[in-house]
């Protein structure tokens, strides 16, 4: 059953030295659960390699063959994720490419894995997350699209109230297998800072938009503005990818609720970019 004690010195010297206790679980034969996920009385838990039950938000790399979990906490000192920017930056740059999945085990001494839509507090602010509800990836933060919204490692990607809209870069990475075939490696979703960062992407092709005979600029979708009211105007195109490309990009516009904008309306962000 469950028991809460200070770790033995040989298991975790730092926790032993700090007199910091943690929850552990042993089965009826006295075997300690460690380095694995376990379902106990209908709820799923995860245990570090030294047996400590996990709580809170964690990135985990699971090694089933060796009963081993590599665990990162939000403030471990490397690849931190104790604020929104660090969470997304490190999820895209390190955790997702490395095969790590984000899980949430509640606060305090709860420890039960959360699934479905969940609110998680990071750096004093509440963030919307979505964790897989079933299957082999149950509890893992979703990376991809759910209900017309985009998620990275479970976190909903949305614009803040000042920006109104934000561009999300979907990056797909491929690799080559032993047979020399091109196969999917991983996919990440990255929020770009603003329209200028979007236009600066290598595969975004821009050209100045001409002024027509009426002194107006066509912004597309029957949206014309007087040239004198526009400081910058560009026609945007995208690189055409071929079968040999090992990295591809797609771009999506999302609003403050995280909904992907797929209509042809006149959408203007907080910096007056259409």
What are these regions (language model features)?
Residues 1-274:
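Extracellular adhesion/carbohydrate-binding repeat motifs centered on closely spaced tryptophans
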């Amino acid at each position: 059953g469950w028991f809460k004690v200070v770790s033995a010195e040989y298991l975790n010297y730092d926790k032993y030295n700090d007199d910091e206790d943690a929850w552990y679980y042993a089965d009826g034969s006295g075997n300690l659960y460690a380095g694995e996920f376990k379902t106990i009385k209908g709820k799923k838990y995860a245990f570090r390699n030294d047996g400590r039950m996990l709580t809170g938000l964690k990135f985990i790399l699971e090694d089933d063959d060796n009963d081993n979990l590599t665990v990162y906490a939000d403030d471990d000192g490397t690849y931190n994720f104790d604020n929104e920017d660090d969470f997304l930056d490190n999820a895209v740059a390190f955790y997702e490419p490395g095969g790590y999945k984000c899980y949430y085990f509640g606060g305090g001494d709860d420890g039960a894995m959360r699934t479905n839509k969940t609110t998680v507090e990071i750096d004093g602010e509440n963030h919307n997350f979505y964790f897989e509800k079933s299957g082999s990836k149950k509890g893992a933060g979703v990376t991809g699209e759910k209900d017309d919204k985009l998620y990275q490692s479970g976190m909903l990607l949305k614009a803040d109230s000042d920006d109104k809209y934000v561009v999300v870069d979907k990056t797909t990475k491929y690799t080559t297998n032993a047979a020399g075939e091109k196969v999917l490696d991983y996919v990440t979703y990255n929020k770009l800072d603003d329209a200028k960062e979007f236009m600066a992407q290598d595969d975004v092709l821009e050209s100045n938009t001409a002024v027509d005979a009426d002194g107006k600029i066509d912004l597309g979708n029957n949206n014309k503005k007087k040239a004198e009211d526009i400081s910058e105007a560009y026609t945007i195109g995208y690189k055409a990818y071929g079968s040999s490309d090992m990295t591809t990009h797609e771009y999506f516009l999302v609003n403050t609720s995280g909904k992907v904008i797929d209509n042809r309306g006149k959408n203007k962000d907080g910096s007056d970019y259409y």
